[in-house]
């Protein structure tokens, strides 16, 4: 199994073949990065296996929870600020990270379309490079196995009106719950909406959530400058109070992206200070267009007041204030996009999580195929080199086979213990070739000499050709084995 180091600036991939054994995986105390000595098993149970995404203030990893019956996947988010931030900015960023954990604990376990919180913890570790102690913060949440809607549009193009209407309806139901708890999400956008393998829609990334405590769902404090360019309404960009209607505005812009595949900058007419999204080629029913137009109005009080009201209109009701006029205007979206957290899984391509992850499934999913094949090629060539040397020095079959067997066992053991990796194998093969070049007697196996004579090649060139053939044979064998293993795994997970 390969484990990623989460220390900023390291990110080394560490291989531990013994962790493919389920019993070892669940009983081992700790493993450390071979480069910086960072603990790899976070909080004693979470094993990072893949980087999902990285933003200005955090990184997200796909991880295994080794203390669950199915070895379930989860998302581990690390507070990882970058750039030149002053102490006030760092404190704000950390408070937002902690707030996401609090919100997920409060909301996730109560709504099945919001990820659950599994853990939140600090980690104090020594840095051998500086001699100082570093502190890191981690948040562990449910892994949603799917694709965010931004990537869906990038890959497949705009959605149909029926699909967009479904997304809008599902999101309104989720926001009705969120707003009902007194929270405002403040970062609704396509990359924070994810559809899983079964088609269920989820709302992600609660790092920008703000509690609404005054007025009609309004915050009694100013809003921090945290938003995504093009999706935030004027009141949010100005740092003013935020409302449920703030999220509804961002949801409307999200719907425009899903319908057209175009960004807000492409659909907003800055010269006339209005949205210009209704193109002749875009077929959208008048009722849906009217709902979107009203949600895009610049003043919060002119939009729908709640998600429930929008749902009522979509279901045939009239709402409280009638329809918004076509071509509704709004202030030019300006400001800086300060994205606090990466979307947990939006940066990753859809993964097919096994139904019952275990020793075999994890070995298959986490196997670095190219590295295995390359190391197999180096091993195959090394075995040919040493086989020729053994037979050349000891023509007696039993002795040469014994020596070759010991060499094979030694190489396998050294690779298992990670004493010999790609770099070391390259060095070993290079030194072997130099030895063959310096000592001709090491390559005087009669069959090699005979083959060199037939090919009219120097003996050393013939030896290298034989080594290449051995490398190809090993690579082909490994590739066939991996193919069979993956096919077998695919069949078993569908039973």
From Swiss-Prot:
Name by which UniProt lists this protein: Serine/threonine-protein kinase F
Origin species: Synechocystis sp. (strain ATCC 27184 / PCC 6803 / Kazusa)
GO molecular function: ATP binding; protein serine kinase activity; protein serine/threonine kinase activity
SUPFAM superfamilies registered for this protein in UniProt: Protein kinase-like (PK-like)
Region entry Disordered, spans: 316-354
Family classification: Belongs to the protein kinase superfamily. Ser/Thr protein kinase family.
Keyword annotations from UniProtKB, A to Z: ATP-binding, Kinase, Nucleotide-binding, Serine/threonine-protein kinase, Transferase
Top-level class of the enzyme under EC nomenclature: transferase
Pfam family, one: Pkinase
Transmembrane parts of this sequence: none
Disulfide bond annotation, renumbered to this chain: none
InterPro entries membership: Kinase-like_dom_sf (IPR011009), Prot_kinase_dom (IPR000719), Protein_kinase_ATP_BS (IPR017441)
């Amino acid at each position: 199994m390969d484990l990623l180091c989460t220390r900023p600036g390291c990110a080394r991939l560490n291989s531990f073949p013994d962790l493919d054994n389920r019993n070892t995986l669940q009983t081992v105390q700790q493993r450390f990065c071979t480069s910086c000595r960072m603990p790899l098993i976070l909080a004693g149970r979470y094993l990072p296996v893949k980087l999902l995404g990285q933003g200005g203030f955090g990184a997200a990893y796909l991880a295994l929870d080794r203390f669950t019956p199915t070895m379930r996947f989860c998302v581990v988010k690390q507070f990882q600020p970058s750039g030149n931030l002053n102490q006030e900015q760092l404190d704000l960023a950390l408070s937002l990270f902690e707030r996401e954990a609090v919100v997920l604990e409060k909301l996730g376990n109560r709504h099945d379309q919001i990820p659950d919180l599994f853990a939140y913890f600090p980690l104090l570790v020594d840095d051998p490079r500086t001699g100082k102690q570093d502190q890191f913060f981690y948040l562990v949440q449910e892994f949603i196995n799917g694709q965010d809607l931004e990537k869906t549009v990038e890959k497949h193009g705009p959605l149909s009106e029926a699909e967009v209407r479904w997304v809008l309806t599902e999101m309104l139901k989720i926001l009705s719950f969120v707003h009902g708890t007194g929270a405002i999400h403040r970062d609704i956008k396509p990359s924070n909406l994810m559809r899983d393998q079964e088609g269920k829609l989820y709302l992600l990334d609660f790092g920008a959530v703000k509690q609404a405590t005054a007025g009609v769902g309004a915050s009694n404090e100013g809003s921090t400058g945290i938003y995504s360019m093009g999706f935030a309404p004027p009141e949010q960009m100005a740092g003013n109070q935020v409302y449920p209607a703030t999220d509804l505005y961002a949801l409307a812009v999200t719907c425009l992206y899903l319908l057209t595949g175009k960004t807000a900058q492409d659909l907003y007419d800055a010269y006339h200070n209005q949205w210009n999204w209704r193109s002749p080629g875009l077929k959208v029913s008048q009722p849906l267009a009217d709902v979107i137009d009203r949600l895009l109005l610049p003043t919060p009080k002119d939009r729908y007041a709640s998600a429930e009201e929008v749902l009522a209109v979509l279901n045939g009701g009239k709402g409280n204030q009638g329809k918004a006029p076509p071509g509704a205007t709004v202030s030019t979206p300006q400001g800086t996009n300060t994205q606090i957290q990466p979307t947990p899984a939006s940066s990753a391509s859809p993964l097919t999580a096994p139904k019952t992850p275990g020793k075999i499934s994890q070995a298959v999913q986490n196997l670095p195929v190219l590295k295995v094949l390359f190391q197999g090629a180096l091993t195959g060539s090394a075995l040919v080199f040493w086989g020729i040397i053994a037979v050349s020095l000891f023509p007696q079959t039993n002795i040469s086979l014994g020596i070759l067997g010991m060499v094979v066992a030694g190489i396998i053991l050294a690779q298992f213990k990670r004493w010999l990796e790609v770099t070391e194998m390259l060095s070993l093969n290079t030194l072997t070739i130099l030895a063959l070049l310096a000592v001709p007697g090491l390559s005087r196996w009669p069959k090699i000499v005979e083959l060199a004579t037939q090919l009219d090649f120097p003996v050393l060139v013939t030896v290298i050709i034989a080594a290449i053939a051995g490398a190809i044979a090993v690579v082909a064998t490994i590739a066939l084995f991996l193919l069979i293993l993956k096919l077998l795994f695919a069949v078993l997970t569908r039973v």
